[in-house]
Amino acid sequence: MKKYLLGIGLILALIACKQNVSSLDEKNSVSVDLPGEMKVLVSKEKDKDGKYSLMATVDKLELKGTSDKSNGSGTLEGEKSDKSKAKLTISEDLSKTTFEIFKEDGKTLVSKKVNSKDKSSIEEKFNAKGELSEKTILRANGTRLEYTEIKSDGTGKAKEVLKDFALEGTLAADKTTLKVTEGTVVLSKHIPNSGEITVELNDSNSTQATKKTGKWDSNTSTLTISVNSKKTKNIVFTKEDTITVQKYDSAGTNLEGNAVEIKTLDELKNALK
């Protein structure tokens, strides 16, 4: 009789362990908030293998996994109705989540999104061959870089969406180049992978007396525009990803008034006149 009861007890214990993996709720788990407005349920108890069970729902897809830690970090996986595979990786310090969708083979990427605690994110989409075709980088301040029509050589179209307007350009050699043209003047903003921007101004005007030149100061993120060696304007690209303009006096020696934030593409073009 004792052996029978022990056997029943062992079976019930195993069932309980399996229940940790198959179904978690508010009674047997703890909910942990994650970057990207996600949540993961973590079992209060370890399973038969000494691991904590994890469960999360992303885009209406249920994902499951296990972890050695009870804080919610680990890897969860699931399968969509079309047999494509999903994988959610939660960093050990919970500061980053990586959600990936693979084709049925489990290797060829379809999409990938990395969310960070500071509310920034990187979202990528891949073509039928698993090659990167689109990419969106959302900064913590809400501005973003959008890349489309990315080819196998890494070139493509680029757009920087600022608070009030957007700049357009190209992606090539791991560098984003955004351009604004006003008459003979071309303003180019370069953003390398390192993120440290540089800005240059080129004027095709052949008349030296009215030809504009630009000098970039990386320490202050300021482009100083001059005409005939006389300073006329400062255009500042702030750390908050806004752009301001301030004029010099007629002698070109002192700045006048206050810097004014540029809020439209037309206002930026006017600053180049």
UniProtKB/Swiss-Prot annotation:
InterPro entries in UniProt: OM_lipoprot_Borrelia (IPR001809), OM_lipoprot_dom_sf (IPR023322)
Topology term for the membrane: Lipid-anchor
Subcellular compartments: Cell outer membrane; Cell surface
Assigned keywords, A-Z: Cell outer membrane, Lipoprotein, Membrane, Palmitate, Plasmid, Signal
Predominant location: membrane
Record family assignment: Belongs to the OspA lipoprotein family.
Gene3D superfamilies: 3.90.930.1, C1 set domains (antibody constant domain-like)
Disulfide linkage: none
GO cellular component term, pick one: cell surface
Lipid attachment residues per UniProt (S-diacylglycerol cysteine): 17
Lipid-bearing positions (N-palmitoyl cysteine): 17
Source organism of the structure: Borreliella burgdorferi
Name listed for the protein in its UniProt record: Outer surface protein A
